[in-house]
Amino acid sequence: MQYYDEVQEVNERRKRRILAYYEYIDARTRDQMAEVVHKLIEQRQSQGLSQQNIAEATGMAAPNIARLESCKRIPTMQVLAKYADAVGMEINIEVVPIAKNVAEED
């Protein structure tokens, strides 16, 4: 019985680590996307454009632009690229090292 308990404990720790890592990645991704979206909003506003103007330029529905700007969901790259193009910008992705990895903790 002791071996079974040890295996269960190892599995539980693994599940907790995986969940913590998922939450970390989700939060980091949301923060990064929010930063990009806020830069696009600033650009839109500096040009005096409305959400409706962006909707017309991108072929997207105005409510979808509002939803994008609310940062409640993580947008696709295609959606970000359309919006960026509408305000004369482009999305540039970089791969850079991170200082700390949650998966390596524990």
Locations of regions flagged by a protein language model:
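Charged, alpha-helix-enriched surfaces in structured cytosolic catalytic cores
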Residues: 35, 75-78
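Recognition helix of helix-turn-helix/homeodomain-like DNA-binding domains
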Residues: 56-74
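Short C-terminal boundary/hinge segments that cap the last helix of small helical domains
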Residues: 88-106
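DNA major-groove recognition helix of helix-turn-helix/homeodomain DNA-binding modules
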Residues: 59, 78-94
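Short coil turns linking two alpha-helices in DNA-binding domains
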Residues: 50, 61-64, 76, 90
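Residue-level marker of alpha-helix boundaries and capping positions
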Residues: 31, 42, 70-71
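N-terminal flexible/basic segments that precede or flank functional cores
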Residues: 1-38, 101-106
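Short basic helix-loop element that most often maps to the first helix and adjoining turn
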Residues: 2-5, 9-10, 38-55, 82
